């Protein structure tokens, strides 16, 4: 009896170590709200959209004009040939390059927004699976604890029966050993649960030493009916990574246009004003006068004969189109695979709920009743207990796999209607 009191005390201490942290019950809706609001990686990804928006603003900037001032002295102190001042304002004009740059920046900004949507699509799916994992580990831990409790009670009963001479010592020892083995399984289940809690904290941006979020729901089988053709059509139309690939083809075309525009020569327009002072030289006197000038400068763009940059942009545009076509095929394959996996898991859950659980429980209860009456051996009890535990654990795993398959199906289809 003292041995089992120590074991029970140890379990209580383990539970208290978890409770030393703040354990906060949380619903799936609250959890997903915290993920969208507090996930640090998602917050970092949002900066890409802000940066792309800033790039659009930067692309609208015009080239700065140039203002020059020139002073000339024609040996005025010695020959009295006068002095002159000249102001010139010049402006460089790009022939369509700025407009192409603005359109490219806008397309890149739209691409960044779609990529952010795709990041959140994967984030909410991964976060949901982590939430399901905690529920699974919690229920598996409860199964292990219940099995240990049953064996613990049986071992205590065997100790009493041994003292009264109803069973042999070896049977009492074996029941104690089985209880000890199950206790180790309980400890491992508790460890797995703690690790699942830590993963959940990572998604909501809290430290594991601060708060542990405990899902209030349990694994269940939500009824969902899907039509494969509709799923494929919806995925091609709505899936964010496919939309990003399509937008990337637009970005590549914009880059090609910009590469062509950059081959155009820049034209520089200038406007000047000058003032010449009076020339007092006796041989060539001249009055003071003002002058106005206007000019245009066109560079000789021999470098535009090199078509390397344009050809590279053209190849990238074609590459983006091929990548989009390949992704369309890949999306169809992923949707079909996820649909088949979901259908398989649904059948497995239905099979378990068809009576296997109830049968395993009835067998165990019958064996325990017969054992207490001395009609069956301890080995039969252990076999029935292991069978019942395995059936329960496999059912929980199957429920988890069903829900995870549903998450993956909706992830691959680009839809999301999971409410928890």
Predicted regions and their residues:
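Periplasmic alpha-helical coiled-coil/stalk elements that build and connect Gram-negative outer-membrane
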Residues: 114, 122-234, 345, 388
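Bacterial Sec-dependent N-terminal signal peptides
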Residues: 1-28, 420
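Amphipathic alpha-helical coiled-coil segments
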Residues: 32, 44-56, 119, 123-144, ...
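Small/polar (Gly/Ser/Thr/Ala-rich) solvent-exposed segments
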Residues: 43, 65-82, 92-120, 243, ...
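Hydrophobic, lipid-facing positions within transmembrane beta-strands of outer-membrane proteins
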Residues: 83-89, 231, 290-298
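Metallo-beta-lactamase
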Residues: 189, 240, 398
